[in-house]
Design a protein with these regions (language model features):
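Contiguous mid-protein beta-loop-alpha structural module that forms a pocket-lining wall or clamp
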Residues: 111, 123-128
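Conserved loop-to-beta-strand segment in the C-terminal subdomain of adenylate-forming
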Residues: 60, 100, 139-145, 238
C-alpha cells in the first residue's frame, strides 16, 4: 500500500516497476496472498493486470481511486487521467474477470447536476464490485477551498446518499451472484458460533466479511474453503467445506448476472 502504488520505480523512468515488484514478492516462499492497494488508474495497464492474473498467489483484486468520471471535474481536481482512459481500465478489468474497487467523490466545487448524473450512469454501467464514496470537504490553504461554485452541504449529502443507495443495490446483486460458489477464506476471528474471514475479493478494513459455520474448530490465521450460501449487500454467509490449498476461483465465474441490477 502507498499513496500511489503504481508509482513504484518511476523515479528511474516513466514506466512503473510495480509488475516486477509483484513478481519478486510473489516468488517468496510462504507468501499466500499478495494484494495491491491504492493504485491510481493513470499507470494501470495490461502489463500490470496480466502479471497479477498469471500469479496464483496474487489477489484478483485492485483498488483504484477514480474520484470522478466527468472530464472537467477530473481536470479541476488536477488529475492527469482522462475519462476515456478510466473507462478503458474498467474494460480491461472486466475482460479479465478481476475484482475492482474504487472510491468516488461528490460535491467537488463546480460539480453540476449533469456531472453527478454522469457519475451515477457510470456506476450503473460499470457495476463496481466494491465502491466507497465521500463528500468533498474544503481544507484551509488548498486551491480547491478557494475555487468558485462551492457546493452547499445539503446538496453534497443528497448526492452522496443517492450514490450510496445505488451502490447498495449493485453490491447486493454482485454478492448474490456468488451464492453457490466456493472460495478460499482466511479465518480472522470467531464471533459467537460462527467464524469471520475474508477471501481474496475482500480487502481488510474496507470491504465486507464472510461469516461461516464449521462442524470442526478452525484455527485463526488458517485458510479454509467456504461455500457461499447467502448474501447481504456487503457481507456473505457460508459453510466450511473440505480444505484444499488450490481453491482459487476466478471472479469472472462469480459475477455473471449483470442484468439483476438494471
Amino acid at each position: 500500500i502507498a499513496q500511489d502504488t503504481t508509482r513504484y520505480g518511476t523515479d528511474g523512468g516513466e514506466e512503473s516497476q510495480l509488475p516486477q515488484l509483484i513478481e519478486e514478492i510473489a516468488a517468496i516462499e510462504g507468501v499466500e496472498w499478495l494484494r495491491a492497494l491504492y493504485c491510481y488508474p493513470e499507470r494501470v495497464d495490461e502489463r500490470l493486470l496480466d502479471t497479477m492474473k498469471r500469479l496464483p498467489n496474487v489477489c484478483d483484486y485492485l483498488d483504484l481511486p477514480m474520484q470522478h468520471i466527468s472530464q472537467h471535474i477530473l481536470t479541476d481536481m488536477n488529475r492527469t487521467d482522462t475519462s476515456a482512459h478510466i473507462r478503458e481500465v474498467c474494460r480491461m478489468f472486466k475482460e479479465r474477470g478481476m475484482m475492482l474497487r474504487t472510491t468516488l467523490m461528490v460535491g467537488f466545487p463546480g460539480e453540476t447536476e449533469e456531472d453527478f448524473d454522469e457519475l451515477m450512469d457510470f456506476v450503473k454501467e460499470i457495476k463496481f464490485d466494491r465502491m466507497g464514496a465521500f463528500m468533498f470537504c474544503p481544507e484551509d490553504g488548498t486551491r480547491a477551498a478557494e475555487m468558485p461554485d462551492q457546493i452547499p452541504e445539503e446538496v453534497k449529502q443528497e448526492r452522496y446518499d443517492r450514490l450510496m443507495t445505488l451502490q447498495h443495490g449493485v453490491s447486493l446483486a454482485q454478492n448474490k451472484a456468488r451464492v453457490g460458489t466456493t472460495c478460499r477464506v482466511l479465518v480472522e476471528k470467531k464471533r459467537g458460533s460462527r467464524y469471520v474471514g475474508r477471501s481474496e475479493y475482500e480487502a481488510p478494513e474496507t470491504d465486507g466479511s464472510i461469516f461461516f459455520g464449521s462442524e470442526e474448530p478452525c484455527e485463526i490465521g488458517s485458510f479454509v474453503n467456504v461455500k457461499i450460501t447467502a448474501a447481504k449487500a456487503y457481507d456473505l454467509m457460508g459453510d466450511k467445506i473440505s480444505m484444499k490449498k488450490d481453491a482459487k476461483v476466478n471472479a469472472s465465474n462469480l459475477f455473471m448476472d449483470q442484468d439483476a441490477i438494471r
